[in-house]
């Protein structure tokens, strides 16, 4: 900045001059901090306005200097340039005016042609008109008709005025856009055309005889096209529209076609004035026929000038039009890739949701569309997919199906770009679903991308509801602002953990969160498939109690009373409520909760109440001797979805026989008979209001001394006391606090290692620890923070101390310090480094003492070059363990749900082939649960986290589903809310007979709500080949193994049962295949040194013996040899007990008349014991005087009844 120092003159000062303190030496070198900010004005609204002048005082002893900025823009040329070119609005007006002038000149030319009559004579202006008709008969071409036309004076005056304006405007624009090279401006096509159409008219002003001279004014159509292009560009720039390439190209193509046709029509018509004098319409007809390549030949030019023009026009069309079409096709293909735009008008008049994904796969797309459009009220919604990658072939093929092409719009773009969010009209969307890419190798990076997308959408459209899927639990707190968040690893590990204590919890939850009508498998000849498919249609619904026909009549009654009678009368299962003044959902709040009309009821049923029809029928009242009717509901109306509601039995019992039962008694024990010995067993009534003196069994937080004494008596040694509290160290931010069983003091890290002794203990294998309960082994690649959620549900406070299973983490990589810090407070939690493809690792971690082995999907194998190959290693390893340890319950997580058909694969099993056909049939029928009949899924042995994607989609309609699922999984604990558990039906419990009577028994005795049954049936899987008798007969167990088995069963408390032969004929029929299988299995273990010096005779005998043995014996021998090599006792390896000839499935909310069967496992929602402690002021002794249930705290939590 140049600075000057002038003497201070009072006469020069004025009120508009701003003074500042004198500048120092340092200020002269740089910009003074006192410089005022530059004021910017709108170019559109303040055209030509200049910033005001600023004055700076350089020194107090000198005069002030006024400095004016942007003086270069104050010149006359700059002001004109600003008005004609730079300013968007004014330049748009100028171009619109210019475009109108060009169209007007073309219109005037048409008027001149229509008024022109060559037969009246032609010639110069004010000259005598001469008729050249006779002369022209001797010559073929009348050139005078080409050079001279008849132009009326008013028409000439208007054309001259327009030409003069156009000429002046062109000269002005040439002057303003001059950049040093005048020839570049002169030789432009637009300038040459402008001169041809304007200069001759200006000349006629000064030379009147030339006023009838022909001037090709019709060429102004090309100038109008050029002006229109510029005008559209200015318009898009003014309205900030950037995605206009396709529109511009289509407009250019249409204008080019129109200009070619108009130029050809006018040119041919004028040249034919010297021939047969074609009319303007006939010339237009000829051009259309010619350009459409039809060429009828009824109208043709007769003279060579017009013929030459036709040739020229065709050549121009052959050059120009292909270029235009090529550009249009290219833009069309690009638009097909990018998806175009979702118009603002559609966004304001239609409802749409936006799906943001990093990469769109066909499975994810179909899961979303099937689940989203399964709800009737969402049929009119549109789905806008915003994805940064190009649409793959499979997705493109699906989106071309009419069912989806009318409702799904694919946009290629990024959620981090506001212009792409604008294209998707995110601010008008009903919801935005942001899904993470779970198949990425770096799942943390995938979460980071999801977080940025969520932030970008929240910043752009703060009022749009957000539904976010996150992978890692430690990243969840970054998106807490979202309306609904599903953390994949939290749900996955909690579900896998509950699968170990409540079998097939993963199947139960998956069926609940999938929308189905219960029509799957109804045409199957198998009874279990029809019943399983029918019950799979049950979902969770909600209704306000005051508006409900199901629950309205139970206002003022207890929750337990309402649940039982609603199930008895309508077949619906009431599982929870939400108070109007409280936003928390309570699962089974217990009999203390009194139902109010404002409560929101959550229930399980085939369909919601609003879609149900009620058929009321008057039934005969049952009259039984000695039965009081207080607990019986006389209204027999029910939903038509249940064919028969069985008799609920008696509801009265003698209260004098309800004293406290012994500790080892079952809560479903047969009531003592009174009076006549042939009297039917009775069940206690479900009370309308809770009796505070006889509510529930003793709470779990009381009588710890008794619990400890019982444990001490069993072990005969000192027992480490457990305390109940909240884990002191959470591995990540945002984990829900859960009351758990904890160690009084944290275990040292060295004690957490299972296979290595330390100074605190010398145990090096699971056998040495002498655990009372079976192990739960978890195989994972790394000890991620999500694994913490596997431990917490298994150590929750409501689980009895007797039922706590030791947990062994089999990790590929060593866990980090912070993870060990988080788990060291939990009892009986250990880890070990190893993999499931190493037999030694499996044996050292105690697999033969385990009931459940959980195989977690590895992050490093989630992506594969070939689709669906990510699970190959896991499937093969699990199949190996299935062969080696047939009695083990293996729960496997897969990346792709379609691969579950390979679990426990039997190539020659005709029954599995029949199930495969059933799955294909259900998929063709459009079922969302086509995979449900696969035996591993039905039994809860396989799970894929992608099955829970529908949980997020369902939350759009059912905003409570995520909360209920987290409560069922034990991820969240709400005071007063119950928890999911299971109980097993034994022979002593079969007197109850039906599920409806079981519902009454549980509601009346312990206020538990059953929601389903896990049923296991024996089934013979027929093979396609005859059985090998040798394989079935050559099974022997030596005396030593029997003694070892007996010893381990006495020590581990295992109940012996009937064993089945699990050998299959197809495996034993081919010894070569068995030998290959043996070699493959041996590669899993570390072999010792081979012994030498054995004789050939001994080798031949061993080979003959190996040939005669079955595969089962070979694998058993392999396992025992490795155990001996590792120094492990071979006791406990039961080679006979397996589950290969059984099938299991889940029945959600079965009808009340469903018969109970032996070994059924009933899913229960048990009320929160802490709620009763908080609400009841009675002592533990008064709680133990329960008249309707057992008094021992352990009895209430036993799963074995």
Curated annotation (Swiss-Prot):
Chain ranges on the Extracellular side, renumbered to this chain: 116-152, 207-216, 273-279, 301-304
Q: In this protein, which residues make up the domain named RCK N-terminal?
A: 350-486, 773-913
Q: Where does Na(+) 1 bind?
A: 511, 514, 536, 538
Activity regulation here? Answer: Activated by high intracellular Na(+). In addition to activation by Na(+), is cooperatively activated by intracellular Cl(-) levels. Inhibited by Zn(2+). Activated upon stimulation of G-protein coupled receptors, such as CHRM1 and GRIA1.
Gene Ontology terms describing biological process = potassium ion transmembrane transport; protein homotetramerization
At which residues is glycosylation annotated? 131, 136
**Intramembrane region(s):** 280-300
Q: Record's superkingdom?
A: Eukaryota
Q: Which residues cross the membrane?
A: 93-115, 153-175, 185-206, 217-229, 250-272, 305-326
The positions annotated for binding Zn(2+) are: 750-751, 758, 760
**Ion transport among keywords:** yes
- Give the span(s) annotated as Disordered: 1-28, 1175-1201
Reactions catalysed: K(+)(in) = K(+)(out)
Q: In which compartments does the protein localize? A: Cell membrane
Which family does the UniProt entry place this protein in? Belongs to the potassium channel family. Calcium-activated (TC 1.A.1.3) subfamily. KCa4.1/KCNT1 sub-subfamily.
Domain writeup = The cytoplasmic gating ring domain of the closed KCNT1 channel harbors multiple K(+) and Zn(2+) sites, which stabilize the channel in the closed conformation. Under low-Na(+) conditions, the abundant cytoplasmic K(+) ions stabilize the gating ring domain in a closed conformation. The open KCNT1 structure contains at least two Na(+)-sensitive sites in the RCKs where Na(+) binding induces expansion and rotation of the gating ring that opens the inner gate. The cytoplasmic N-terminal domain facilitates the localization of heteromeric KCNT1/KCNT2 channels to the plasma membrane.
The protein, known as: Potassium channel subfamily T member 1
Q: Which organism is it from?
A: Gallus gallus
